[in-house]
Design a protein with these regions (language model features):
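Residue-level signal for pocket-adjacent positions within structured domains
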Residues: 12, 40-41, 46, 54, ...
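N-terminal beta1-alpha1 ligand-phosphate binding loop
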Residues: 2-37, 43-47
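Short, charge-patterned binding micro-sites
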Residues: 41-71
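Short beta-strand-to-loop capping motifs
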Residues: 15, 64-70, 111-114
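Flexible, gly/pro- and Lys/Arg-enriched active-site loops
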Residues: 51-59, 79-130
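Short helix/loop segment flanking the catalytic signature motif in cyclic-nucleotide metabolism enzymes
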Residues: 66-83
Length: 130
């Protein structure tokens, strides 16, 4: 049986609460364990200064390339991944804080194949609201 169609996605990871290095390592493993996911690459870790709210510890960041099921259409495939990312953030204990504030784990869907994501959901314009 042939594999279902897949899409290459790039996910940004960041953390600055607790042990960010260990958190990002565990998050990469959790991303690889998502149903149907195939990890394709992981960048090195980058130490970055906070933006916006600067009175907080610096961040550790990375980017992961992962092939995921495309879904019946690009919108549903991207939304499924976005919701999975938000679920992982919650599982890692992410707390609701001010914009650009500290993060136990921040996962951002940077690229989903060649698709531009259009989400039909009320938001305030921030990815944190999904």
């Amino acid at each position: 049986m042939a594999d279902a169609p897949r899409v290459r996605a790039y996910v940004g990871l960041g953390a600055n609460v607790g042990d960010p290095h260990r958190t990002l390592q565990a998050a990469v493993s959790a991303l690889a364990a998502l149903p149907g996911a195939r990890l394709r690459g992981v960048s090195r870790l980058y130490a970055t200064r906070p933006v916006g709210v600067t009175d907080q510890p610096g961040f550790m960041n990375a980017v992961v390339a992962v092939d995921v099921p495309a879904g019946p259409d690009p919108d549903s495939g991207a939304l499924a991944l976005l919701l999975a990312l938000k679920g992982l953030e919650a599982a890692f204990g992410r707390q609701a804080r001010r914009r650009w504030g500290p993060r136990e784990l921040d996962l951002d869907l940077l690229v989903f194949g060649r698709h531009r994501l259009h989400v039909e959901r009320p938001t305030s314009g921030r990815s944190d609201d999904l």
